[in-house]
Curated annotation (Swiss-Prot):
General function of this protein: Protein S19 forms a complex with S13 that binds strongly to the 16S ribosomal RNA.
Residues spanning the signal sequence: none
Single biological process term from Gene Ontology: translation
Gene, per the UniProt record: rps19
Cross-referenced PROSITE patterns: RIBOSOMAL_S19
Name assigned to this protein: Small ribosomal subunit protein uS19
GO MF assignments: rRNA binding; structural constituent of ribosome
Gene3D superfamilies named in the record: 30s Ribosomal Protein S19, Chain A
Organism, as annotated: Methanothermobacter thermautotrophicus (strain ATCC 29096 / DSM 1053 / JCM 10044 / NBRC 100330 / Delta H)
Amino acid sequence: MARKEFRYRGYTLEELQEMPLDDVIKLFPSRQRRSLKRGFLPRQKKVLEKIRKIKKEGKTEGRPPVIRTHCRDMIVLPEMVGMTFGIHNGKEFVEVKIQPEMIGCYFGEFAPTRKKVEHGDPGMGATRFSMFVPLK
């Protein structure tokens, strides 16, 4: 079975990439749209400059370089599709390859800051029952 072609609000990825940014912003949900209408923050502009520099140099073929960023509030734009970002989760950089389905989401959604706690087995003396367990 053939894979279904990706569409965002009725537009293909190629159409989204050719559209001016103002038209793409109109397609986003209200929270993202309002955030982008206010303009990009300096750290977001820096990420966009890095993206455009890499695309201009033609390093997008093969395995493009990883763009490391602490900017978790950056919104995924169509021009970012296919690139790899190292998004900081507070401890380390989580590598995320941007897929078309991620358009309109925040970077922070793909690098969770907390992980599930996995407790080990209780040790000796951890419970009252352990008094009756013979030591090995």
